[in-house]
Amino acid sequence: MNATQNIEHNFLNTTPMIAANHFTGERMFKKAYMLDGIYEGKLLDEPLPRTDTVRNTSREYAMAKLKEAGITTDKKIIVYAPTWKGQLYNSLDYDLTELKDAVKTLRSNINTDEYEVFLRVHYFIYRAILMDEEMSKICIPFTVDTDELLSVVDILISDYSSIFFDFLGTGRPILFYVPDLKDYTENRGLYIPMEEMPGPVSENLEDIAGYINNIEEIKKEYKPKYDAMYEWCCQKEDGGVSDRVIDAVFLGKEDETMNCKNDKTKLLFMADWTRPFVNQVGLTKLFNKINYDKYDVTLLTGKPKKKEQSKALEKLDPRVRILVNNKRLNATWSEKNKIFRGIRARKTSIEEAAEIFRRGNEWQRLVGDSKFDELIMVRPKSAPLNWLVLSYVAPIKKKSLVVTETVRESAYELPEMVAHFDEISDNLDKIQRYKK
């Protein structure tokens, strides 16, 4: 969850976006990131413009670029392009010795009179490889564009890297070497089951070498899967993608888009999961009973500060879309003081506080142009007043507030702070209309 908590906000504030292919559009954007039903922008049904480079780059040009970078060969080119496996941007889990041994194992088990093996690594470890004299000779530098490189690659070996999508359009064989499949799946997850891959998958390099030695048979065996994914992902990769995207984005011409809308009633729950007394148990039970055939549900919550808070969110019904408010209010110190202290001191009205939120585009920062039919706020006693101001500026017609008795008394000490709610109740169990 922490790895993607900014991404949804970025997507919701972006239009147009490029789907890249049907897999990315359907499985990643619409399902994995749950944009289906909430994204109001345009999701262009186009490949990435960079695929034009794979299609349009001449072999002579690409080989000249490689020669300039110190890479020369008259053999068939195999590129091993493992994905980066660091958990953080400044953390690397790669064992360079392991990487070097992998290349040696491949070379010792294939016909090196026919093939040359090169590396294309993530730039996070490229500098480390340059310190190794032997490895630096076979590592493709970044002066050679990845898609220019792919235009002349004969066999690609990868794992979970999205590089294979760019290569898929060439029709050339792809092999998947996945020595850490279980760990990677548990820590980062896979969008495509390995059994659907357009090439053989193995945890053993000797197997990969065997596939290379029998590559024509492998191509025949995996042709149905390759063709199926090609049909799904590469149909529109015709070398003219850039022109169509420029026309759609900058010239306003109509282009095919993927539909992200549904007819469900859109519910937005505002409940800061990190605050005590938020009634997590009651909310979890409610989410388990909602009629998801009728309702599209989003939970806007605070950034988890403890592991148990993250785990509690992960246990919610998977159909609940979670948006995390993980940044502080976009306001100056004096403006924040005007909100948090001024309201309680009766010196700042809710409308004055709301104006600060509007100037900072606080609502749009969190949900973009998303439209909701109902807002349900669950507010514990310790919740800061800025959540009430946020609910005030929300462009949603129907608003409900659920509070405990003690909080209700506290809230009514500031009656104008809750006057914008159409309904106030003191128990989540009273919310019956959303249940199956």
Model-derived features: where do they sit?
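Short, charged/polar "capping" segments at the starts of alpha-helices
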Residues: G25-K30, T53-V54, L88, F124-M131, ...
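Short acidic-hydrophobic, aromatic-tinged amphipathic segments that line or gate anion-handling sites
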Residues: K137-T143, M197-Y211, I322-N326, E423-D426
